[in-house]
A protein has these predicted regions:
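Short beta->alpha connector loops at strand-helix junctions that form conserved
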Residues: 79-80, 103, 126
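Conserved AMP-binding/adenylate-forming core of the ANL superfamily
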Residues: 12-59, 63, 67, 84-89, ...
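Conserved ATP-dependent adenylate/AMP-binding module captured primarily in the ANL superfamily
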Residues: 83-112, 136-142
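Flexible acidic/glycine-rich loop/turn elements at helix↔coil and beta-strand↔loop transitions
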Residues: 6-12
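Short hydrophobic alpha-helices that are characteristic scaffold elements of the AMP-binding
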Residues: 66-72, 94
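Short acidic/polar active-site loop segments enriched in Thr and Asp
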Residues: 47, 98, 120
Length: 144
C-alpha cells in the first residue's frame, strides 16, 4: 500500500518496529521519510526506470528508502552486507545503479568501493565519510 494512504489515515500508529533496538517508525514518519527520499532522488536527476543499490544491515531506514524508490519509479537492488567489496561492486555495476546507499556500520566495505564507484552518487546512513554524503542530512533539506 502507498505510504501516503496510511500516513494520512494513521499518522501516529507504528508502521515499523525494529526488533533489536525497539525503534518505532510511524506511518506518518514513513510517509514523510519516503517522500523526502523520493525528492532527493529526483533532485539528483534520477528518472523512472533508473536504479539504486542499497547495502544495509538491519536498519530502520531500509523501508523508507525502498518506498522512496517506488514513489520515484526507480528499481532498487538490495545487496547483502556480508559480501566482499568486489562482489558488491559487481552487483552495483550490473544493476546500473546511479545511487549507492550504505551505512556507517559498513564503512570499511564502503571505503574499499569508493574509487570504483566514481560515477555513482554515494550516501551513508548514521554519518558520512570520504565521498559519501550523509543520507539523513541530504533528505532533511528535501520537502516532506
Amino acid at each position: 500500500m502507498h505510504p501516503g494512504i496510511n500516513g494520512k489515515k494513521f499518522p501516529n500508529k507504528p508502521a515499523l518496529i525494529m526488533n533489536g533496538s525497539g525503534k518505532v517508525v510511524t506511518h506518518g514518519e514513513l510517509n514523510d521519510l519516503s517522500n523526502q527520499g523520493a525528492q532527493l532522488f529526483r533532485s539528483l536527476g534520477l528518472v523512472p526506470g533508473d536504479s539504486i543499490a542499497i547495502m544495509l544491515e538491519n536498519h530502520f531506514l531500509f523501508f523508507p528508502i525502498i518506498f522512496a524508490a517506488w514513489r520515484s519509479g526507480l528499481r532498487y537492488t538490495a545487496i547483502s552486507w556480508r559480501l566482499q567489496p568486489d562482489e558488491v561492486e559487481y552487483i552495483v555495476r550490473d544493476c546500473e545503479a546511479k545511487v549507492f546507499i550504505t551505512s556507517k556500520f559498513l564503512e570499511e566495505t564502503a571505503l574499499n568501493l569508493d574509487s570504483s564507484l566514481k560515477d555513482v552518487h554515494k550516501f551513508m546512513l548514521d554519518g558520512s565519510t570520504d565521498n559519501y554524503l550523509s543520507y539523513e542530512e541530504s533528505i532533511a533539506s528535501q520537502p516532506e
